[in-house]
């Protein structure tokens, strides 16, 4: 029987084993909390660390204990003036009871709060999406880095030594310490030689020669003590990692907000948008998100309005595509930005507009987009009705024509969270072949 030894280091002041056991025990509560955060939070913040609160009763490990509402106990209590021997003492009421009216007199407990790491948040988010393990690793993978110059350092590899900065420091140190120059020493040596070569100079300038020789000896000793280049002068080129690539992407989120799109449909759409954002965040340094919602009119809105506004009305899908085209022309030229689009709808559209949508995609948008994904959100009971992909609404049939002509267009139907991933399967399969626009 194999033995497994966990040699992973514990985080600072924490026990990794205890933390994992706690997360396993509280998994359902954490999944519910993360799901609520995904519903109410911003798409760009899903893969960040999360402060999670959960009831304190779920923190303690399971243990057997006496039932507080039944049983008989005998205690020896100190005497008092209120009770006599044989009196029955009522049980203490508590705030932990089943919903008593009023504040209560017992003690209650605050919620337990702790921080989930980015990896733990993504694990909980991916759990019911049924992503393959390799895709999970790709989405959670940190961005690649390239080393770039970032100043100088006093330590480093000899291959990174900066000669110019080193000699500059050496020169400043020699000036500050008054290191004798070669010119001064040569001038003294020439003066001594001149006096010695004069007729009778040795006797005539004996005292002067002695002073010059002492000065020369002192300068040479000082020059030897103060090196030309000292270890404190040496500077190395410093490098620090910076994320790659230096490309920018914009993600357009288009959604039908007519009356037929309820909370369930919007929740599935948001999960789809989150997954696409995580994929793009791994590939690009900067990502802008543009939210466009439409009924019979379309407009660019903020994220809160996009998901939670109560506006409703008819359905004209082409207005959203026209709004997207307008925003691209004004702010996101295709030669500078990598454009991705995700459209969520229940498939309802006004008569005759679906052909207009297909024409806009074919003639205008698909040539600008790196990838366009359309998801049609249906009821689980409808999955059997639409057994073949050719059946469906007029919008679905019109988009099938676009799907056959453009390889960067993908469409699918989703009825539950596990259906979201297949729309990315084609994108992940073609990832090495896709070329970024520069």
From Swiss-Prot:
UniProt-listed InterPro entries: UPF0229
Location of region: Disordered: 55-107
Superkingdom of the source species: Bacteria
Pfam families linked to this entry: DUF444
Compositional bias per record (Gly residues), positions renumbered to this chain: 92-105
NCBIfam families in UniProt: PRK05325.1-2, PRK05325.1-3
Family, per entry: Belongs to the UPF0229 family.
Cited HAMAP family: UPF0229 (MF_01232)
Protein name, as recorded: UPF0229 protein Smed_1028
């Amino acid at each position: 029987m194999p033995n497994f030894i966990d040699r992973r280091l514990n985080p600072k002041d924490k026990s990794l084993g205890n933390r994992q056991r706690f997360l396993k025990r509280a998994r359902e509560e954490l999944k519910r909390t993360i799901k609520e955060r995904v519903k109410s939070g911003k798409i760009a913040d899903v893969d960040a660390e999360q402060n999670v609160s959960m009831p304190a009763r779920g923190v303690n490990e399971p243990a057997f204990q006496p039932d507080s509402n039944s049983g008989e106990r005998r205690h020896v209590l100190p005497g008092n003036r209120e009770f006599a021997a044989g009196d029955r003492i009522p049980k203490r009421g508590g705030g932990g009871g089943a919903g008593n009216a009023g504040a209560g007199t017992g003690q209650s407990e605050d919620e337990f709060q702790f921080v989930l790491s980015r990896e733990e948040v993504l694990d909980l988010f991916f759990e019911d999406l049924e992503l393959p393990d390799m895709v999970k690793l790709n989405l959670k993978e940190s961005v690649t880095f390239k080393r770039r110059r970032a100043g100088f350092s006093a330590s480093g590899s000899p291959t990174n030594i900066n000669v110019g900065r080193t000699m500059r420091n050496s020169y400043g140190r020699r000036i500050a310490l008054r290191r004798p120059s070669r010119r001064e020493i040569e001038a003294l040596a020439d003066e001594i030689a001149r006096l010695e070569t004069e007729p009778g100079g040795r006797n005539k300038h004996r005292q002067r020669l002695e002073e010059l020789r002492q000065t020369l000896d002192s300068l040479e000793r000082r020059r030897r003590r103060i090196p030309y280049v000292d270890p404190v002068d040496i500077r190395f080129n410093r490098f620090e990692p910076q994320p790659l690539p230096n490309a920018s992407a914009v993600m357009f989120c288009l959604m039908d907000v007519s009356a037929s799109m309820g909370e369930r449909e919007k929740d599935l759409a948001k999960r789809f948008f989150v997954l696409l954002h995580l994929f793009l965040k791994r590939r690009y340094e900067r990502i802008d998100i543009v939210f466009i919602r439409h009924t019979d009119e379309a407009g660019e809105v903020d994220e809160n309005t996009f998901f939670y506004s109560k506006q409703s009305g008819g359905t004209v899908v082409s207005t959203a595509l026209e709004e997207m085209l307008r925003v691209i022309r004004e702010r996101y030229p295709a030669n500078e930005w990598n454009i991705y689009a995700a459209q969520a709808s229940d498939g309802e559209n006004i008569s005759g507009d679906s052909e207009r949508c297909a024409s806009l995609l074919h003639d205008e948008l698909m040539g600008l987009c790196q990838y366009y994904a359309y998801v049609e959100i249906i009821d689980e009971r409808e999955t059997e009705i639409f057994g073949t992909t050719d059946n469906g609404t007029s919008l679905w049939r019109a988009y099938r024509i676009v799907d056959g002509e453009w390889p960067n267009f993908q469409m699918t139907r989703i009825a539950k969270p596990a259906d979201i991933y297949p729309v990315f399967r084609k994108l992940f399969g073609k990832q090495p072949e896709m070329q970024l626009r520069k």
